[in-house]
């Protein structure tokens, strides 16, 4: 990692310092991809969220994995903001895209056990409907 940019990031955020101390290996892997220099597309964010969680069936592991992913992305966004590598509109869009992706995967993860326990959600017209969050 670029030492000067890292110092700016750590001075800007105690949270970034904490995340680095816990998840340094992940952060170095993430940094190796693009040095946190490029914005993430909506598709990239959805892909990384889905791919990180797709093989997990245990709720505890799933929750831990999404929390780690959130911390990694937050570190990236703090880095980009502290080093003036991202504008406010792009940062806001990426945060929003991550929230949307997290809701989608959480809904998909929760649906199977809910259907097994309660059956498919059915509307007043007796047609199966999507689980609404």
Residue spans of the language-model regions?
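Non-catalytic regulatory/linker segments of enzymes
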Residues: 1-133
